């Protein structure tokens, strides 16, 4: 997967589905992580770019969060960060969120359900991205 740069921000993970580009960058949050409590926390920043000729609206999301042992946690919900953003053609929406793991490494992927032209539906894939602890010597992903 090729890195993507937008406004001088480097996104290591980027994918285009149906003319919608989803780009992701992550950050390990050492200050919120606690190995003694089996807690490792990451933030992720998502950039959604609408390269379609029509306006789209993000309706809901699906995440599959997998830790290094293969344990999977699935998350479904309306919108993102309490919003169901409307994204006009050639415009973008970005947000940041986070996720904890009970292991020091893992990865996430998923999809957004979007609508356009009133009620036509699009499934937009979120690229798989790595959640690796930079303090760990062995990187799995």
Per-region residue spans from a language model:
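Membrane engagement elements in two modes
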Residues: 1-41, 53-57, 66-141
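Acidic, contiguous internal or C-terminal segments within carbohydrate-active enzymes
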Residues: 42-47
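Asparagine-centered strand-capping/turn motif at beta-strand->loop junctions
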Residues: 48-52
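Beta-strand signatures of extracellular beta-sandwich domains
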Residues: 62-64
